[in-house]
Amino acid sequence: MKNIRNFSIIAHIDHGKSTLSDRFIQVCNGLSEREMKEQVLDSMDIERERGITIKAQSVTLDYTARDGQTYQLNFIDTPGHVDFSYEVSRSLAACEGALLVVDAAQGVEAQTVANCYTAIEQNLEVIPILNKIDLPSAEPDRVAQEIEKIIGIDATGATTCSAKIGIGVEDVLETIVAKVPAPEGDVNAKLQALIIDSWFDNYLGVVSLVRVKNGTIKKGEKFKVMSTGVAYQVDRLGVFTPKMKDLDHLKAGEVGFIVAGIKDIHGAPVGDTLTHAHNPTDKPVPGFKKVQPQVYAGMFTISSDDYPDFREALEKLSLNDASLFFEPEVSQALGFGFRCGFLGMLHMEIIQERLEREYNLDLITSAPTVVYKAIKKDGEIIEVDNLSKLPEPGAIAEIQEPIVRANILVPKDYVGSVITICIEKRGVQVDLNYVGNQVSITYDLPMIEVVSDFFDTLKSVTKGYGSLDYELIRYEPANMVCLDVLINGDKVDALASIVHKDQAKYKGRELVERLKELIPRQMFEVAIQAAIGGTIVARSTVKALRKNVLAKCYGGDVSRKKKLLEKQKEGKKRMKNIGSVEIPQEAFLSVLKK
């Protein structure tokens, strides 16, 4: 056991984490030259296209160090984006050490700081590594100082490397062997194994990635899942090198996969503990905090025939992504679908993209909202993640909205523009610190403002250098109202939203004008209105198409023409009363995308 090293890499998007892991695999001959491709561990197409890591992956490599001993390195890859911080905390729970990889040209970013604190809280040994030192703009000394000032860990003599051209990779591996502590645990004790991740394979059933804390698990043995008490038999177990490599057993300190023919998707929940069926342990391994969805949206299939496939796809995805929440929902405008909870907007986009690609579904998503608290006059508190749960306006004493503490790191040239967008988003400044070239700005912001398009705006005003990390801190009363959209007097539930009263008129006008362009002209007039309760705050009209009924009259008497026009008017009136407006799918999509 003393030769096992479990570690993960903490790094911001684009700081070279996936490339460094490719080099580890090459140096340790994990894959043959023919099988190597860039970003081996980013197995999803979306991960490669967007250049981000979404799912945690694991690799076991054998490395012969300079002291002549062979070490087993269990490396767990982690995502860098703020929406996937839960994946990070899961990966860290299985490690004794973490490499903090920082781009020597760009410096420390906000998410790296947040993930680094998670690692320190879990008592991991954090080792700073400066990557990309081959770049002409690299300033390793400045960045090392930044690491010390912002994060507070000693970065003097930090290992430097360039994963792209392969310099210093062996030094990094030597540093891991020297500094990451060996795992603790007893091979002969009762079995305790923590499930770090599970996913559904169409041939094997549920595949679980586990970290064995104590004891040994062998092929053919029976184990049980502690939260459900159900027992299964091990069909296959082994490690990823990144390919699946079968072994006879996994012992304390190791990280590997277990396949037990579990067909029920919820059979092996992430964060659970496995133990022997015949000689179980009393206490589970302390898992990690259950994560609460922050953003909710309705998802509907464009054709109602896909509904059963949609449900199955969500169930399979939720096994692999423990932070996805869903429940059935019906909308008058969009039909049957699910109300889904996500960690943030990127998470929502990725889930929608995965559903559309991997399961061939055509989906439409309603406007995202966060969880508000409505306090009724009789003191009852209702959590509102869906507008249909909002009580009547007369019964509400106050609405409270979630406030997040946002920590923004930007180069000092952009401070002014960042403060401006924070003020526009109703933010309150908490702190501002200059650290070398970077400025750390802390703001309390309403969560709805952060999840809608704050990240994109921040990136554009800071030319891509700004980074953001946020956490929910409290709820506070806010002047929120429900903005309804009426088309010919009928409410369209899919377009309703909760907005701040000060912005209601502006948002209403914007929405109405946008719909006016998107709804095709009908044979009768279509009135589009935005309303708060009974008050109309904006209105627009799609003019009617009309046939020229006087075309056949040529000359003739004026009273004859009048009669025809009156008749047309009557017909239009009747049509307006009984005609319904077809709103094209594009209109919904365009309005909801904003």
UniProtKB/Swiss-Prot annotation:
- Recite the UniProt keywords alphabetically: Cell inner membrane, Cell membrane, GTP-binding, Hydrolase, Membrane, Nucleotide-binding, Protein biosynthesis
**Sites where the protein binds GTP:** 14-19, 131-134
Q: Which Pfam families match?
A: EFG_C, GTP_EFTU, GTP_EFTU_D2, LepA_C
Q: Which EC numbers does the record give?
A: 3.6.5.n1
Q: Which family does the UniProt entry place this protein in?
A: Belongs to the TRAFAC class translation factor GTPase superfamily. Classic translation factor GTPase family. LepA subfamily.
Task: Identify the PANTHER family for this entry.
Answer: TRANSLATION FACTOR GUF1 HOMOLOG, CHLOROPLASTIC (PTHR43512:SF4), TRANSLATION FACTOR GUF1-RELATED (PTHR43512)
> What is this protein's record name?
Elongation factor 4
Organism (species): Francisella tularensis subsp. tularensis (strain WY96-3418)
| Gene name as annotated | lepA
